[in-house]
């Protein structure tokens, strides 16, 4: 991932209001950030933000009352040495939290070395938690996929398929049936956790759906506020096909999945043909997926019934025809 756009200035701009940050000194170092190597070797955002620790040179260092009290108890020689070590590590920036006053020597050294120094009245724990969450989102793996992303029965569903199959028309019909649009054509996905992928709409395409023959439709204006969603977790991919290929099975014994950002996502394949009610089929696929997530597998139940019937036909069919 390109980390050049992640610097002290961008982090300050994105978090100043929420964290009540003030930029005390070191404005010349606004371009300071994380190297690609630092980001690549970090196991999580916890490696990038934390309390004052000289062992982690590239971490955003947060100083609170405990750290400043410890500093005050040191001799002048130790104070100078610790401050010199801290600045020499070239952290992206420093934060003095908890409403405590920044030590004068720290302010002086940050000014001389162009090290950004922020202050905030918020507690160090709150600052660290917020910045870790922010860094997790900024540095999370992401990808853009083609399709129509919808909220169907509370589940994030991505409609995919070749151009001209009617994905947008199907999306429009599903919206008219009370479901919500997240994004059309291009969907930005980001993996924010170990077990979920979140999808959003690019700002340029917000609330818009393109339908052939009608052009661009503003779904929010036409159907109202409840017809659009800001984001959804991706749980199901519905692939539309003109005709089934050689691998298509009417009763697949194993669930199909698609790898999205390293996470397997359930997938169903629906053939597009004249007379088929695709909206009903998609809704049924979503309902079936919800049951599967709850541990209810209809196909497995049927196979169990079949096995029992083969073992003891009389118990399953007491009224056997003669």
Swiss-Prot record:
Residues 271-276 are annotated as: Important for the catalytic mechanism of dephosphorylation. Mg(2+) binds at residues 168, 210. The keyword Magnesium applies. It is an enzyme of class 2 (transferase). The keyword ATP-binding applies. Both phosphorylation and phosphorolysis are carried out by the same active site and suggest a common mechanism for both reactions. Catalyzes the ATP- as well as the pyrophosphate-dependent phosphorylation of a specific serine residue in HPr, a phosphocarrier protein of the phosphoenolpyruvate-dependent sugar phosphotransferase system (PTS). HprK/P also catalyzes the pyrophosphate-producing, inorganic phosphate-dependent dephosphorylation (phosphorolysis) of seryl-phosphorylated HPr (P-Ser-HPr). The Walker A ATP-binding motif also binds Pi and PPi. PANTHER family: HPR KINASE_PHOSPHORYLASE (PTHR30305:SF1), PROTEIN YJDM-RELATED (PTHR30305). This is HPr kinase/phosphorylase. It comes from Paraburkholderia phymatum (strain DSM 17167 / CIP 108236 / LMG 21445 / STM815). The gene is hprK.
């Amino acid at each position: 991932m390109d980390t050049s756009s992640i610097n002290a200035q961008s982090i300050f701009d994105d978090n100043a209001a929420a964290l009540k940050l003030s930029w005390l000194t070191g404005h010349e170092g606004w371009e300071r950030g994380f190297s690609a190597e630092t980001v690549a070797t970090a196991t999580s955002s916890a490696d990038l933000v934390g309390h004052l620790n000289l062992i982690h040179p590239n971490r955003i260092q947060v100083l609170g009352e405990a750290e400043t009290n410890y500093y005050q108890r040191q001799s002048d020689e130790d104070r100078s040495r610790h401050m010199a070590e801290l600045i020499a590590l070239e952290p992206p920036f420093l934060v003095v939290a908890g409403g405590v006053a920044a030590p004068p020597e720290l302010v002086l050294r940050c000014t001389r070395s162009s090290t950004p120094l922020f202050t905030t009245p918020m507690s160090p724990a709150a600052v660290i938690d917020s910045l870790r969450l922010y860094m997790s989102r900024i540095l999370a793996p992401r990808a853009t996929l083609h399709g129509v992303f919808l909220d169907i029965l509370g589940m994030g569903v991505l409609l995919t398929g070749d151009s001209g199959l009617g994905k947008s028309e199907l999306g429009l019909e599903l919206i008219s049936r009370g479901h919500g649009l997240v994004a059309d054509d291009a969907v930005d996905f980001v993996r924010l956790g170990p077990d979920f992928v979140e999808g959003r709409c690019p700002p340029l395409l917000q609330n818009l759906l393109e339908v052939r023959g009608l052009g661009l439709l503003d779904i929010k204006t036409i159907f109202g506020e409840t017809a659009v969603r800001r984001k959804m977790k991706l749980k199901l991919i519905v692939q539309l096909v003109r005709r089934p290929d050689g691998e298509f099975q009417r009763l697949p014994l194993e669930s199909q999945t698609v790898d999205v950002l390293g996470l397997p996502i359930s997938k169903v394949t629906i053939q597009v043909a004249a007379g088929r009610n695709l909206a009903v089929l998609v809704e049924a696929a979503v309902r079936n997926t919800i049951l599967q997530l709850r541990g209810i597998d209809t196909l497995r139940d049927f196979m169990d019934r079949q096995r029992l019937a083969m073992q003891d036909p009389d118990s399953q069919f007491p009224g056997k025809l003669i």
